[in-house]
Amino acid sequence: MTELKNDRYLRALQRQPVDVTPVWMMRQAGRYLPEYKATRAQAGDFMSLCKNAELACEVTLQPLRRYPLDAAILFSDILTIPDAMGLGLYFEAGEGPRFTSPITGKADVEKLPVPDPEQELGYVMNAVRTIRRELKGEVPLIGFSGSPWTLATYMVEGGSSKAFTVIKKMMYAESQTLHLLLDKLAKSVTLYLNAQIRAGAQSVMIFDTWGGVLTGRDYQQFSLYYMHKIVDGLLRENEGRRVPVTLFTKGGGQWLEAIAETGCDALGLDWTTDIADARRRVGHKVALQGNMDPSMLYASPARIEEEVASILAGFGNGEGHVFNLGHGIHQDVPPEHAGAFVEAVHRLSAPYHL
């Protein structure tokens, strides 16, 4: 087993004792850090940054040099899989991700390959191996993927969406086509995450960013069903250690019980879910990650500390909490506010672990 100097994060995900509540931030390697902006400028563009193992490693490590975070997360993008399937990912200034060849019907879905993660996505595995080497066992490395439903929304809509009418039209008018796409994506995500684990990811997370736009019944059928399939197919042990799995559906607070049934180790919570309520409902079964509103980082350090105290009190004593934001950190947050957040979590959580 490779030695880890700090395994708090992995222990908390398995609801084992820790000295303080571990903390990391979604998008902790990102545009709020001036050093990230400098490295991105050096890379030329976002995907060039993702595809250069040394630079992806550099931006992964940048937040760890600033803050005593309890985990590193691979610097990559959820849309690497659709890009590897040949949809032609590009980023439009102010518009976010776009695809040159979105999915328009069954013929497009049938043509899609299931990418070989060590070939078409080999650059991600190179980044994982490079980051693990450079971390030198300081903290665990988190690998990740988008969920099949969330990836499908981008692939069918052709990019970001506000109303999701194009994919919902497919869901209601051509459900077999959508199921075919989701099934291919579930296979691709399983292979991709297992390759990340073999390359050295010590925990993995599935981001279901758009699951919350569905009705309860549609969520079960078009999102959760496929995440469950992935969880069933994942390597759960590597390097002599359990590899915990976290599922995060943004806007999914009403479905926590169903998500906990998948066999995952932890649930991500967004800031609209009360953490005390979540723990009462599923805390006997899974760990919880979250869930401060990312916009709270615009507040004063004193106000941030109050919010941290309130969330810690909501979760209460004992194990099974990984502190995080309820979604990614905003790009214009002052870096010192992120530092105040991390420091407050460690300092204020110790009494809950006596």
From Swiss-Prot:
Alphabetized UniProt keyword annotations: Cytoplasm, Decarboxylase, Lyase, Porphyrin biosynthesis
Extent of the signal sequence: none
Main subcellular location: cytoplasm
Residues noted as binding substrate in the record, renumbered to the chain: 27-31, 77, 154, 209, 327
Disulfide bonds, paired cysteine numbers: none
Annotated pathway: Porphyrin-containing compound metabolism; protoporphyrin-IX biosynthesis; coproporphyrinogen-III from 5-aminolevulinate: step 4/4
SUPFAM superfamilies (alphabetical): UROD/MetE-like (SSF51726)
InterPro entries: UROD/MetE-like_sf, Uroporphyrinogen_deCO2ase_HemE, Uroporphyrinogen_deCOase
Record-level GO BP terms: protoporphyrinogen IX biosynthetic process from glutamate
Keyword Lyase: yes
Site description Transition state stabilizer, residues in chain: 77
Catalytically driven reaction(s): uroporphyrinogen III + 4 H(+) = coproporphyrinogen III + 4 CO2
Subcellular compartments: Cytoplasm
GO cellular component: cytosol
Root EC class: lyase
Name of the protein in question: Uroporphyrinogen decarboxylase
Gene: hemE
